[in-house]
Amino acid sequence: MKYGRFTALVLALNLVFDGVAFAGHNNDIEINSDRNFANNETITSDKRTIVGSGVTITIAPDAELRLINNNTTNDQASVVETGLTGASDIAFNGGKLILRREGDGVIIRANGGTTSALTFNTESTLLNGTASRGIDADKSSAVDFADGFTLNLDRSGSTTGRDVVGLRLAKRAHLNTTFADVKLTAGDSDSSLTGIILDDGVFSANKLN
């Protein structure tokens, strides 16, 4: 079993350049319209993704929203994804947010292009699960965390072999955050463990833990 802690040193060493259903127009998306959450709520879905493009999610200041994707048939499944139904923004505002991916795949995928932005203006943002990738962004996508984020990928019980990557930014995609706290744990079958891959992408953080 391999463990990784994402620190400024690790960043320098690891740089690689190379149960709720909502009606909607796309059956592969759980939430495809604006939503307000006044109380603590957990949404578990086996869709292709839970939150699709063109959506604003507002969480009450004292509330916590958990979004869990447990799709076991699609290794491309995600929790949040821009570009799945065209170029359009996604925004999260308000209280506490937890995004969890159970199974292979990715927690956040941003590939909507230059006209898409993924913005987190939440009190706290936690990304966790057994996915092989935390954030995967390309095609000039913009991902912004106003108050930072924590990423914890724990694949210690996984039996599928993958290349585990915390953050991958390619094709002029950029990620901006006040801080990033990242921990990666690979399973025995996984072939590699990398904190961040920059393939013509940009990563900017005021603080790394």
Question: Language-model features: where?
Answer:
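Surface-exposed loop/turn motifs in large extracellular/passenger domains
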Residues: N26-N27, N32-A38, S45-I68, T73-N209
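Gram-negative bacterial Sec-dependent N-terminal signal peptides
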Residues: M1-F22
